[in-house]
């Protein structure tokens, strides 16, 4: 949505966008979502309510693929609350292959009885309201959710978030050592979720369950804050 620019410009853009959408949105669900005040970008991380979010999808392109499940886990710098989290299997319009069923750790019966996304989209947005969303790889959750809202309601749903993959890239793939590796043709360090967690001594979890991956993302972010930032870091400095 936004071209690469200074972090202050990113903050200013999001604040303007939120204010515009709160007025312009015709859909009452999206209107309520945008009327929830955006967290002040100067608020320290220690005072922020976060929501880790993960989508499991049939592919990587929201134009041609669908959401099959989503998981949310609320947390702060002091605690992660998986018992207050949420997990939902979604019935896609396409038929899932046997490989996809196994990959996403869901069953045929779960898919058969699951609601379509349009029946649970309002619940998802309600749970995200008032929180700073944290994901691992922003080019899945935000565009899939945006396109789903646009298909259903004809309006966009965009919001600032924190991307633990982007944070990892910032610290693990920059600097003169990484530039030298690139010139020598050396493969860059992996910033996938499990590989990133291993660098912080975090345990390995079974992947591709949306709530488990949301939990893993929350834990990774807390470890990144301890190593690279501070509880007093302003939340706006990490917005994507």
Describe the function of each predicted region.
Residues 4, 14-152, 156-158, 184-208:
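Conserved non-catalytic scaffold segment of RNase H-like nuclease domains
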Residues 155-176:
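Histidine/lysine/aspartate-rich catalytic loop segments that bind and position anionic ligands
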Residues 213:
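Conserved catalytic/binding loops enriched for acidic/polar residues
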Residues 216:
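Short active-site alpha-helical segment characteristic of glycosyltransferases
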């Amino acid at each position: 949505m936004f071209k690469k620019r200074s972090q202050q410009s990113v903050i200013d853009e999001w604040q303007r966008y939120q204010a515009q959408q709160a007025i312009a949105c015709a859909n009452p669900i999206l209107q309520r979502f945008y009327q929830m005040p955006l967290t002040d970008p100067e608020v320290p991380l220690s005072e922020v309510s976060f929501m880790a979010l993960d989508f499991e999808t049939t592919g990587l392109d929201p134009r041609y693929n669908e959401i099959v499940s989503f998981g949310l886990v609320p947390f702060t710098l002091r605690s992660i609350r998986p018992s207050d989290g949420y997990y939902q299997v979604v019935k896609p319009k396409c038929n899932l292959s046997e490989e996809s069923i196994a990959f996403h750790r869901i069953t045929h019966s779960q898919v058969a009885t699951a609601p379509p996304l349009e029946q649970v989209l309002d619940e998802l947005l309600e749970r995200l309201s008032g929180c700073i969303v944290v994901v691992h790889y922003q080019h899945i959750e935000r565009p899939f959710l945006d396109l789903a809202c646009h298909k259903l309601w004809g309006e966009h749903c965009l919001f600032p978030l924190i991307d633990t993959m982007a944070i990892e890239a910032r610290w693990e793939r920059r600097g003169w050592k990484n530039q030298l590796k690139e010139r020598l043709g050396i493969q860059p360090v992996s910033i996938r979720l499990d590989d990133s967690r291993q660098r912080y001594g975090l345990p390995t979890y079974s992947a591709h369950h949306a709530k488990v991956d949301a939990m893993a993302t929350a834990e990774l972010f807390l470890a990144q804050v301890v190593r690279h930032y501070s509880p007093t870091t302003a939340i706006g400095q990490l917005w994507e």
